[in-house]
């Protein structure tokens, strides 16, 4: 039985921080204690874990010295990780970082446990393990087993990303915009989190535009997929924010070196870890955001061959990005790290 771990959660009052507590409980992770950390404005508030209340403390440079911990989950933004992760590492903890700050650093493993758990062994180089972007995680969980079988050479993906990808503020803004719509005042609504009103709308921009006219979010999917799969894979992404509260959806087109047997591809995906196939289009059965919200799996459907090219496969992929795309993946990393540590 694994030794119980002292856990710190940086960003404990945010959407991912709150979900981390739920997932740690559900996956029965061996927890001795919880140290919830946040900014000064949240100090004094409480979070609950397994029926016990823990007071939120302020994140400072000395808090990890004063409160020794084993694992620190960081989910409070890249600038916070940049400033404070080193203090957790110096105190002897492993940092599992949910932000984008460390992902592409050479010596920091970028891990999806279903795809590249072997990379966790490199954590000692920096004391940090990076959690990939939410939209990347669900995609590579599907790509990995198919790549192993058919040798993937290119991926084209269009995402349909929920408001909660922008945190609690994103969810709240969508709800308020819909309330404005039902009050016949949507034209008066002023968005703060998104560049435009999201209610009844689609926004083909997530994060800032780069010099090549791709957004930062789109390039994350390109670069992170290549790093996780250890393959110089061609990836092109178009990321769109949609008026859905929770769960990201993706339409994925995969180009392979070999001809695809769709029946075999479905069987491979049915056996893939953390993947659930819902694919019965004649009976209108396929994954959707509402059915996948608050779950820990990646759902796949609409699996079909290309009409023109036998080396191309199309599918539809949906997952709760707060869980699969952040909290659940982070806890699964911690589980694998603990297994490795105990060997």
UniProtKB/Swiss-Prot annotation:
**Pathway(s) per entry:** Amino-acid biosynthesis; L-lysine biosynthesis via DAP pathway; (S)-tetrahydrodipicolinate from L-aspartate: step 2/4; Amino-acid biosynthesis; L-methionine biosynthesis via de novo pathway; L-homoserine from L-aspartate: step 2/3; Amino-acid biosynthesis; L-threonine biosynthesis; L-threonine from L-aspartate: step 2/5
The record lists phosphate as bound by 103, 220
Coiled-coil residues: none
Enzyme nomenclature, EC number? 1.2.1.11
Q: Which residues bind NADP(+)?
A: 13-16, 41-42, 164-165, 321
Q: Which domain of life is it from?
A: Bacteria
| Active-site residues, as the UniProt record annotates them | 134 (acyl-thioester intermediate), 248 (proton acceptor)
Q: Alphabetically list the UniProt keywords.
A: Amino-acid biosynthesis, Diaminopimelate biosynthesis, Lysine biosynthesis, Methionine biosynthesis, NADP, Oxidoreductase, Threonine biosynthesis
Which Pfam family, any one of them, does this sequence belong to?
Answer: Semialdhyde_dhC
Q: Which GO terms describe its molecular function?
A: aspartate-semialdehyde dehydrogenase activity; NAD binding; NADP binding; protein dimerization activity
Catalytic activity, as annotated: L-aspartate 4-semialdehyde + phosphate + NADP(+) = 4-phospho-L-aspartate + NADPH + H(+)
- What GO biological process terms does the UniProt entry carry, in alphabetical order? 'de novo' L-methionine biosynthetic process; diaminopimelate biosynthetic process; isoleucine biosynthetic process; lysine biosynthetic process via diaminopimelate; threonine biosynthetic process
Q: Where does substrate bind?
A: 161, 241
Subunit-structure text: Homodimer.
> Which family does the similarity line name?
Belongs to the aspartate-semialdehyde dehydrogenase family.
Task: Quote the function comment for this protein.
Answer: Catalyzes the NADPH-dependent formation of L-aspartate-semialdehyde (L-ASA) by the reductive dephosphorylation of L-aspartyl-4-phosphate.
What is the protein name for this chain? Aspartate-semialdehyde dehydrogenase
């Amino acid at each position: 039985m694994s030794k119980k771990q002292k856990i710190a959660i940086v960003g404990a009052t945010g959407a991912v921080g709150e979900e981390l507590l739920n997932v740690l409980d559900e996956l029965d992770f061996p927890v001795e204690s919880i140290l919830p950390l946040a900014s000064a404005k949240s100090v004094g508030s409480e979070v609950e874990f397994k029926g016990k209340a823990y007071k939120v403390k302020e994140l400072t440079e000395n808090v990890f010295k004063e409160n020794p911990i084993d694992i620190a989950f960081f989910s409070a933004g890249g600038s916070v990780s940049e400033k404070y992760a080193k203090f957790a590492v110096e105190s002897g903890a492993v940092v599992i970082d949910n932000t984008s700050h460390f992902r592409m650093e050479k010596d920091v493993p970028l891990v999806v446990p279903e795809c590249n758990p072997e990379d966790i062994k490199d954590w000692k180089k920096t004391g940090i393990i990076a959690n990939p972007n939410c939209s990347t995680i669900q995609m590579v969980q599907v790509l990995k087993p198919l790549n192993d079988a058919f040798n993937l050479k290119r991926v084209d993906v269009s995402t349909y990303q929920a408001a909660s990808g922008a945190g609690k503020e994103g969810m709240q803004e969508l709800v308020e915009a819909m309330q404005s719509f039902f009050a016949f005042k949507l034209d008066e609504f002023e968005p703060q989190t998104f560049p435009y009103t999201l209610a009844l709308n689609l926004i083909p921009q997530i994060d800032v535009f780069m010099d090549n006219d791709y957004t930062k979010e789109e390039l994350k999917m390109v670069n992170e997929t290549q790093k996780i799969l250890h393959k110089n894979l061609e990836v092109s992404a178009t990321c769109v924010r949609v008026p859905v509260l929770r769960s990201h959806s993706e339409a994925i087109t995969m180009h392979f070196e070999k001809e695809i047997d769709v029946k075999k591809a479905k069987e491979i995906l049915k056996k893939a870890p953390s993947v659930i196939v819902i694919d019965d289009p004649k009976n209108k059965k396929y994954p959707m955001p509402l059915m996948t919200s608050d779950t820990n799996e990646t759902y796949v459907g609409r699996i079909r061959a290309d009409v023109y090219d036998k080396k191309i496969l199309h599918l539809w992929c949906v997952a709760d990005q707060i869980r699969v795309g952040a909290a659940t993946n982070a806890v699964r990393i911690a589980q694998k790290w603990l297994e490795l540590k105990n060997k």
